[in-house]
């Protein structure tokens, strides 16, 4: 038995399929052929971003069907009255209630100790924000955010790499003897695991200890070794879709993942500057603001 991994649709592909197939079918199913509602691109994008979180189309189809049923009910409740044909964003919220998902965007400002990572979930790629803070203590590493064992080991490896190269990052040799470091990845109720957060965790720590903020339009993914090498990770297609969707402009990836770029749609690649790297040292000046 061979398992095939199918990459998710781009946002543009979802919109095209919705307008060409899903919306006409659901209008017909709801008996609205004589008074068809008009879906705008803005409304379909709202359904995709705020009412579904998926790599495929099942959820989007259900939400479009729900809007059509609500519209049919509205017409039946108001016989003789003209119901506006256009479905507005306000009507979507009236029909479906408040948004179910928060559409993640690149940070609005640059912050010290906060890096943007790219993760792969069952619903496709998404952004994760790694936060690092420091306080007086005794060499403890605190990790929160429902992290799995592999991700915890990635954080420990990142810290060990930075400690062993403290001089390179202009960190006093005895600094770690008197401080604790706390790493947190928000959405604490959502379990997180995997090695691909190693690079963004390392960058968050370098930013914190050097007091240089991470550029807000930069996202990273990659496994980090104790010697600072970057190893390839999976899910590159979906991760890059998530980066582009969120307004990220530069994505730093392991050099070993360059081979995966040939499968990325051209309209996605034209909006992203991809920076392949093999060592952590190669990405510091690209990712950190001066």
Regions found by a protein language model. Name each.
Residues 4-65, 70-85, 165-174, 212-215:
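Conserved C-terminal "switch" segment of AAA+ ATPases
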Residues 1-3, 180:
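Short, solvent-exposed beta-strand edge segments and adjacent coil->beta transition regions
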Residues 84, 102-105, 111, 115-116, ...:
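Peripheral, non-AAA+ core regions of ATP-driven protein-machinery
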Residues 42-134, 138-144:
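Conserved catalytic-core segments of large NTP-driven translation/proteostasis enzymes
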């Amino acid at each position: 038995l061979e398992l095939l991994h199918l990459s998710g649709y781009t946002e543009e592909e979802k919109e095209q399929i919705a307008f060409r197939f899903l919306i006409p079918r659901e209008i017909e199913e709801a008996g609205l052929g004589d008074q068809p509602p008009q879906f705008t691109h803005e409304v379909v994008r709202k359904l995709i971003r705020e009412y579904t979180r998926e790599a495929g189309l099942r959820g989007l189809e259900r939400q479009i069907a729900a809007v059509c049923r609500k519209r049919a009910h509205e017409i039946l409740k108001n016989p003789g009255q003209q119901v506006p044909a256009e479905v507005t964003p306000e009507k979507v919220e009236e029909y479906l209630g408040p948004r179910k998902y928060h559409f993640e965007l690149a940070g609005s400002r640059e912050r010290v100790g906060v890096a943007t990572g790219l993760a792969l979930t069952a619903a496709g790629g998404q952004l994760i924000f790694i936060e690092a803070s420091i306080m007086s203590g005794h060499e403890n590493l605190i990790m929160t955010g429902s992290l799995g064992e592999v991700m915890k080991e990635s954080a420990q490896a990142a810290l060990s790499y930075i400690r062993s190269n403290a001089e390179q990052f202009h960190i006093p040799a005895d600094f770690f003897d008197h401080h604790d470091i706390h790493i947190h990845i928000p959405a604490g109720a959502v379990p997180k695991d995997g090695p691909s957060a190693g690079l963004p965790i390392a960058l968050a720590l370098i930013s914190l200890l050097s007091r240089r903020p991470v550029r807000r339009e930069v996202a990273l993914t990659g496994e980090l070794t104790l010697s600072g090498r970057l190893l390839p990770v999976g899910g590159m297609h979906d991760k890059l879709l998530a980066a582009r969707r969120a307004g990220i402009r530069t994505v730093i990836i392991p050099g070993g993942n360059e081979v995966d770029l040939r499968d990325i749609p051209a309209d996605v690649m034209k909006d992203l500057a991809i920076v392949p790297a093999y060592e952590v040292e190669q990405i510091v000046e690209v990712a950190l603001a001066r």
